[in-house]
Amino acid sequence: MGKNRLKETRESMLMSKTELARQANVSPITVSRIENGMPCRMETKRKILLALGLQPADKHKIFKD
């Protein structure tokens, strides 16, 4: 399981898991799994990045892979 900076980034934006999930159109369970280091699809990463106000090219700021 790889680590990522999703939880740290989300919390710094004062955003709940539920709010991020709603904005990214994914389930809160998906957000939890990703924050715990589980892998996810590229499309899910894209949705999360956009919900955080980032561009797909900024994926290195959140995800290691």
Per-range role (PLM):
Residues T18, P28-I29, A57:
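Key DNA-contact positions within bacterial/archaeal DNA-binding proteins
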Residues N25-C40:
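Recognition helix of helix-turn-helix/homeodomain-like DNA-binding domains
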Residues I62-D65:
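Short hydrophobic/aromatic patches at helix-to-coil boundaries
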Residues M42-H60:
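DNA major-groove recognition helix of helix-turn-helix/homeodomain DNA-binding modules
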Residues N4-Q23:
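Short basic helix-loop element that most often maps to the first helix and adjoining turn
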